[in-house]
């Protein structure tokens, strides 16, 4: 009876729909019912399976209604055997969510299931655990909730847009994926787009650092420039024009003229033949990050700020390779959608539709920042790992910050041991110094050797460059003022390097008769030398870049009161030879450090160095640490030391204060010996770009040292009429100039060289004036008579002399006062080096030195220089006095110290 009741119920229900459905899914239902629920095949089997089973029977006729269930024995011949394939299908059907979703959708669209619970019993044969699956599917997020745009908004909400510079936020992709309830691969898409805009940076595997939007405008400005270099705007215009032409062929008017079919492949070819895409063939270049940067470039270079999706896809995706396989092209278009979703979440673009003749096309409009005029023009360092495809085409524009001041010339050779000395000096313990971080030093030292090697091989061009260099004319010095001198020296903090004497070639230069110079200036000038070609054209200044010798020479005009112009040197430099220069007169000179160094290095560090001067004659040693290379024949004079004068150490006067028209009393004073009515002039820093009023009044030779090779700084005032320099020694010109060598405080044993003496015959008569004889820079005439001043300490600034000089050669030497604060403390400045002479000597080799330097004193000075701390920086005069008392001095120096009490 129960079976009959079920049959009647089945007849009442709309069986036709269920029967159709059963026939449709007969095979799947048969497999599931037979192999899964064989144990349940009882007379209570639902009517859902009866039509399926009976329809498969060949003996089934409409007259035979299934009153009783069919026995399993009757169906055995028609059943497929139990195979692994059938088992796999069953497992897939049970476990795959997609298959279950399809089954659910099919059931929802069945009319019988939209009515009453007519088939409650049919649900009894569902897969075991299906109720739990339904609960799980209720918890699963919808497609909208899983969208990348919404996920990116949730991701960005976790971090501040403008984080503080002090706080460092680290993003763990695993934690974020668990927190947001998504897979980690979804977070990868977001992070790659954010990394392309420098909002995040990779720290480690699955670890990123959050930077925020601080550098976003600069990044967009950089991408805009790169997009302009890639000519993306022209490519978009070309593609749009091709599409317009295609529409013209399709709709009309050109077909009448026998023009080709619009489906012609030539018309549909948007390949990269005419406008090659910047995409490369490597896998990294096709990454989502690179595509994101290019996608942003399209918006930044577009005039309308609207980019359609198909144009972006044709430009950014290599259609020439993917044209046969449209599935790959569509996949990459989906990646553009992913990028657009993230950019939309960042509020940089929004989705719009462009209406054309064919209909609406998806497009995106840029709503982010467009005005980059207020942004600093300095380019971001777009590394090759981020934009490798732009490295070849836009390399010169990306590395604008790389100044080409590391170029050297083959005429100046460098000893390789100087780099070892620099590394040794840098490794010593010393007071903290600000590092040079300007754009002028952006090139690494590792590339220095390659640049040098290349320049050494190109000697012919370099010699031609030096031979074409113009040197302004120098006027004869006034004899009445020839021995007046004022020196304002600021201590430098570069390491000292010395090289062999044989490394100095003849300095070739050509004097210009008009005082105008024409020197090719490199396109990428350093920050420390703000010398424009216009300035060079109007000022008697010669600027020779990237050599190892730094010289500044000048002369005063005949008949006029000498004036001094100060030049700032752009850093230390190597002296390529043991140079002993004979001066014909003294003049007021001031040397300052690089303004970038003045800002970086602490003021107390600059104040800690002093300069002493005493007349000495010395040949520069080949090695700073060698104690036997000081060739100084000691010949004492009449025993009287030069008088003392107030010393004014130049400490921390900023370069901005030293402008024309404003006196700097702490930098120089006028010497009244010989011409008391001489008026002091002010200093002119070269970085102020102030042109002298009288171009013929002062001439300077400025030779810049390459970055990273810091050494001596040489100041040479020229006092000779112009001579043409020829390679032969007989035709070499002569410069009778006092010279000053400023050493680095890092290597204390090496002395400061200062030459106030004169070349030629020196008369012992008090009234005779020096003869401004010639001095050649050639090796054959390099040995000349000179007085040199040696001191590893700092050099002080002389003031007007009030006491007469007993030495005829030093008749007009200004006296020195060691302490301007304490006028009572007078004492003779004795040299740090044991070598002390008063008479001119010629340059000799190291083995001719009768008085070698004491290694003990040299080593002591070396330690004192490095172990100065800012806490111990007091008055430099007191420190020097204590250092002089505690230093091991020679007998000659002690005698000088005793005799110094006379002028007091």
Swiss-Prot record:
InterPro entries: E2F (IPR015633), E2F_WHTH_DNA-bd_dom (IPR003316), WH-like_DNA-bd_sf (IPR036388), WH_DNA-bd_sf (IPR036390). Residues 252-269 have a biased composition (Basic and acidic residues). Residues 61-80, 252-283, 560-628, 846-904 are annotated as: Disordered. GO terms for biological process: chorionic trophoblast cell differentiation; DNA damage response, signal transduction by p53 class mediator; hepatocyte differentiation; negative regulation of cell population proliferation; negative regulation of cytokinesis; negative regulation of G1/S transition of mitotic cell cycle; negative regulation of transcription by RNA polymerase II; placenta development. It comes from the Eukaryota. GO terms for molecular function: DNA-binding transcription factor activity; DNA-binding transcription repressor activity; DNA-binding transcription repressor activity, RNA polymerase II-specific; identical protein binding; RNA polymerase II cis-regulatory region sequence-specific DNA binding; RNA polymerase II transcription regulatory region sequence-specific DNA binding. Induction: Induced at the onset of hepatocyte polyploidization. It is found in: Nucleus. Interacts with HIF1A. Homodimer and heterodimer: mainly forms homodimers and, to a lesser extent, heterodimers with E2F8. Dimerization is important for DNA-binding. Interacts with MN1. In contrast to classical members of the E2F transcription factor, atypical members contain 2 DNA-binding domains and regulate transcription in a DP-independent manner. Both DNA-binding domains are required for DNA-binding and are proposed to form an intramolecular structure that is similar to the winged helix structure of the E2F-DP heterodimer. This is Transcription factor E2F7. It comes from Mus musculus (Mouse).
């Amino acid at each position: 009876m129960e079976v009959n009741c079920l049959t009647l119920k089945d007849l009442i229900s709309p069986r036709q729909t269920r029967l159709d459905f059963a026939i449709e899914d007969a095979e799947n239902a048969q497999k599931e019912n037979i192999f899964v629920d064989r144990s349940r095949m009882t007379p209570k089997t639902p009517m859902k399976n009866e039509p399926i089973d009976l329809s498969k029977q060949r003996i089934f006729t409409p007259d035979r209604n299934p009153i009783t269930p069919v026995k399993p024995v009757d169906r055995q011949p028609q059943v497929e055997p139990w195979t692994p394939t059938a088992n796999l299908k069953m497992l897939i059907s049970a476990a795959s969510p997609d298959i279950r979703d399809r089954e659910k959708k099919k059931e929802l669209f069945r009319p019988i299931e939209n009515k009453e619970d007519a088939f409650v019993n049919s649900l009894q044969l569902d897969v075991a655990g299906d109720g739990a699956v339904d609960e799980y599917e209720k918890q699963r997020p919808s497609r909208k909730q899983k969208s990348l745009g919404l996920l990116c908004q949730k991701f960005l909400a976790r971090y501040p847009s403008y984080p503080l510079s002090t706080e460092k936020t680290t993003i763990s992709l695993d934690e974020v994926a668990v927190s947001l309830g998504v897979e980690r691969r979804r977070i990868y898409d977001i992070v790659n787009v954010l990394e392309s805009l420098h909002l995040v940076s990779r720290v480690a595997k699955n670890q990123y650092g959050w930077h925020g939007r601080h550098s976003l405008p600069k990044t967009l400005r950089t991408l805009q420039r790169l997009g302009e270099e890639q000519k993306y705007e022209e490519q978009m215009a070309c593609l749009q024009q091709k599409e317009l032409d295609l529409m013209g062929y399709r709709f009309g008017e050109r077909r009448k003229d026998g023009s080709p079919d619009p489906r012609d492949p030539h018309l549909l070819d948007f390949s990269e033949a005419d406008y090659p895409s910047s995409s490369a063939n490597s896998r990294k270049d096709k990454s989502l990050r690179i595509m994101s940067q290019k996608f942003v470039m399209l918006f930044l270079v577009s005039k309308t700020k609207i980019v359609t999706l198909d144009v972006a896809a044709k430009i950014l995706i290599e259609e020439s390779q993917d044209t046969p396989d449209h599935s790959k092209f569509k996949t990459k278009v989906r990646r553009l959608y992913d990028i657009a979703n993230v950019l939309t979440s960042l509020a940089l673009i929004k989705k719009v539709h462009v209406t054309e003749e064919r209909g609406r096309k998806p497009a995106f409009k840029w709503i982010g920042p467009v005005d980059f005029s207020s942004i600093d023009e300095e380019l971001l360092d777009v590394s090759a790992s981020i934009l490798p495809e732009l490295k070849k085409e836009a390399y010169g524009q990306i590395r604008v910050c790389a100044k080409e001041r590391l170029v050297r010339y083959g005429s100046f050779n460098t000893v390789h041991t100087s780099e070892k000395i620099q590394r040794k000096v840098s490794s010593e313990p010393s007071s903290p110094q600000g590092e040079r971080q300007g754009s002028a030093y952006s090139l690494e030292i590792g590339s220095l050797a390659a640049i040098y090697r290349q320049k050494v091989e190109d000697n012919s061009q370099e010699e031609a460059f030096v031979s074409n260099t113009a040197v302004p004319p120098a006027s004869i010095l006034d004899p009445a003022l020839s021995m007046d001198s004022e020196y304002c020296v600021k201590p430098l903090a570069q390491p000292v390097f010395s090289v062999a004497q044989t490394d100095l070639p003849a300095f070739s230069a050509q004097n210009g008769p008009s005082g105008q110079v024409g020197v090719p200036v490199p396109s990428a000038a350093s920050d420390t030398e703000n010398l424009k070609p216009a300035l060079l054209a109007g000022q008697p200044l010669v600027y020779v870049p990237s050599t190892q010798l730094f010289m500044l020479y000048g002369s005063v005009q005949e008949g006029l009161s000498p004036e001094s112009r100060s030049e700032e040197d752009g850093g230390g430099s190597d002296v390529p030879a043991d140079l002993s220069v004979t001066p014909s007169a003294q003049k007021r000179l001031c040397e300052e450090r690089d303004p970038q160094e003045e800002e970086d290095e602490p003021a107390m560090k600059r104040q800690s160095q002093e300069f002493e001067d005493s007349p000495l004659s010395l040949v520069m040693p080949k090695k700073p640490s060698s104690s036997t290379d000081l060739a100084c024949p000691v010949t004492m004079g009449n025993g009287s030391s030069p008088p003392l004068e107030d010393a004014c150490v130049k400490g921390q006067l900023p370069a901005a204060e030293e402008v024309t028209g404003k006196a700097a009393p702490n930098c120089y004073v006028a010497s009244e010996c010989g011409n008391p009515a001489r008026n002091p002039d002010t200093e002119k820093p070269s970085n102020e770009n102030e042109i002298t009023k009288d171009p013929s009044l002062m001439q300077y030779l400025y030779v810049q040292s390459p970055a990273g090779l810091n050494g001596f700084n040489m100041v040479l005032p020229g006092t000779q009429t112009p001579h043409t320099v020829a390679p032969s020694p007989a035709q070499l010109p002569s410069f009778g100039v006092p010279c000053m060598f400023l050493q680095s405080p890092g290597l204390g044993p090496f002395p400061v060289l200062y030459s106030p003496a004169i070349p030629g015959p020196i008369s012992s008569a008090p009234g005779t004036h020096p003869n401004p004889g010639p001095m050649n820079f050639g090796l054959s005439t390099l040995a000349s008579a000179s007085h040199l001043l040696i001191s590893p300490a700092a050099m002080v600034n002389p003031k007007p002399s009030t006491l007469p000089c007993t030495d005829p050669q030093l008749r007009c030497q200004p006296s020195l006062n060691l302490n301007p604060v304490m006028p009572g403390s007078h004492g003779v400045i004795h040299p740090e080096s044991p070598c002390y002479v008063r008479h001119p000597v010629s340059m000799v080799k190291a083995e001719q030195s009768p008085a070698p330097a004491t290694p003990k004193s040299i080593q002591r000075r070396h330690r004192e220089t490095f172990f100065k701390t800012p806490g111990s920086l007091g008055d430099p005069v007191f420190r020097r006095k204590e250092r002089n008392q505690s230093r091991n001095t020679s007998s000659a120096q002690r005698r000088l110290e005793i005799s110094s009490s006379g002028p007091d």
